[in-house]
Swiss-Prot record:
Mg(2+) binds at E25, D27, D85. Expressed by the venom gland. GO terms for biological process: killing of cells of another organism; lipid catabolic process. This is Dermonecrotic toxin SdSicTox-betaIIB1bix. GO terms for cellular component: extracellular region. Transmembrane segments: none annotated. It is found in: Secreted. Gene3D superfamilies: Phosphatidylinositol (PI) phosphodiesterase (3.20.20.190). Binds 1 Mg(2+) ion per subunit. It comes from Sicarius cf. damarensis (strain GJB-2008). Keywords: Cytolysis, Dermonecrotic toxin, Disulfide bond, Hemolysis, Lipid degradation, Lipid metabolism, Lyase, Magnesium, Metal-binding, Secreted, Toxin. Its EC number is 4.6.1.-.
Amino acid sequence: WIMGHMVNAIEQVDKFLNLGANAIEFDIDFDKDGIAQITHHGIPCDCGRKCTKKAIFTEYLDNIRQVTTPDDPKFREQLVLLALDLKLQRISSAKAYRAGEDVAKKLPDHYWQRGNSRARAYILLNIPLVEDYEFIRAFKDTLKNEGYESYNDKVGINFTGNEDLDKIRDVLEILGIHKQVWQADGITSCFARGTERLKEALEKRDTPGYNYINKVYAWTLVRKSIMRRSLRLGVDGVMSNNPDRVIKVLKEKEFADKFRLATYNDNPWEKFRG
């Protein structure tokens, strides 16, 4: 999976897909009451990027629904995964549950259209910190209460704050989540990051019977040398400002026979058995 990073304006979607991304990440900004308002990262952000691109969240969902719906004029077959980077750290932790309720209503309204949409992308909920886990509880509670619990099959969980992996496991255990879990490891492209935690996540992913990490990705990679390093370690995905660079690295002799781009037929919730 090649995740285009910080794709917050509607016009950026095609740009990142044209560069080779088969997944996109966009930021969800909430008001003080936990209501999802816009797709927006804000300052600071990655080096060399404009931090202020934005769209109204519901309008963004309406557009991305078309892009991921077969036979729609806007359909792009390669886009199979949407990563929602939930900016919960900007609101009170007490509002995390309300935020989860809100997103769990807006997705059925604007993406799945209450069962009337054929939009098919998988969705990854990126939670910044384990202290915001009530968002997940609210999201699942609300889908159930709204009668759309079946959509949980299309939704995965990911904690992005580089926290202790055992602490994350404990929270997932509290929530009763034992599947459909990704684990991110990374830092803004402005800085270098070691591989200790990334290696630990990959080791846990590959441990038989360990159900708290199904996929691992590294972010935000812009240098080809770091992309190569991550691929050698065996990541499932790379988040990048430059998907075209990832494509070029994947075509190199060292990686061409070991990796390929994920398609809709690849289940993002299953561990890869090479």
